[in-house]
């Protein structure tokens, strides 16, 4: 019989109960280096200082608001990209998976350039299991993603 990884019921919580939303900052005063800088479109360049030394999930504040990024520490984010760190009761990789299924455009606060605020993100409600189950789920999906990427690279090599 297969071992079940699912233990408890999932609780409905606001995102502010499982994560902390941090603001990006301007990087132009920094020198070139090996720390990646991310904006809403992804990787931009590398600098010599970090904004965070904890893995996080990036979500656009302005512009592209519906393409979450998994940010491996250390990193820097510009001011148009929030970075969300996990609280003690949550797994950052699980938060990334949650962010993939949220309909971010539904929470757009603008009449022009798509925008999100910390308050809006904080108040989004979702269902969350205990951290142990979050860890199992995130490991499963990240393993599947890694396997898919490996096979995609192999297919690309075969077509060359």
Q: What residues fall within each predicted segment?
A:
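Amphipathic alpha-helical coiled-coil/heptad-repeat segments
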Residues: 1-13, 127-160
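Conserved, well-structured core segments
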Residues: 36, 82, 139
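A short beta-sheet element
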Residues: 39-100, 109-113, 117-121
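Non-catalytic DNA-recognition/assembly elements of restriction-modification systems
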Residues: 3-37
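Proline-centric
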Residues: 5-9, 83-89, 105, 119-135
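Short, intrinsically disordered, mixed-charge
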Residues: 20, 100-104
């Amino acid at each position: 019989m297969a071992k079940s990884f699912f233990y408890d019921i999932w609780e409905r919580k606001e995102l502010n109960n499982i994560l902390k939303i941090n603001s990006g900052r301007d990087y132009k005063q920094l020198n070139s280096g090996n720390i990646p800088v991310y904006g809403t479109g992804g990787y931009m360049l590398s600098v010599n200082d970090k904004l965070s030394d904890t893995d996080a999930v990036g979500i656009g504040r302005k512009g592209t608001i519906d393409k979450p990024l998994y940010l491996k520490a250390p990193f820097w984010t510009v001011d148009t990209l929030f970075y969300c760190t996990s609280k003690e009761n949550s797994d950052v990789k699980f938060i990334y998976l949650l962010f993939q299924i949220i309909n971010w455009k539904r929470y757009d606060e603008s009449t022009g350039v798509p925008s999100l605020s910390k308050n809006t993100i904080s108040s989004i409600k979702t269902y969350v299991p205990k951290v142990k189950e979050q860890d199992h789920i995130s490991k499963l999906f990240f393993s599947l993603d890694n396997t898919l990427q490996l096979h995609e690279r192999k297919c690309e090599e075969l077509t060359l």
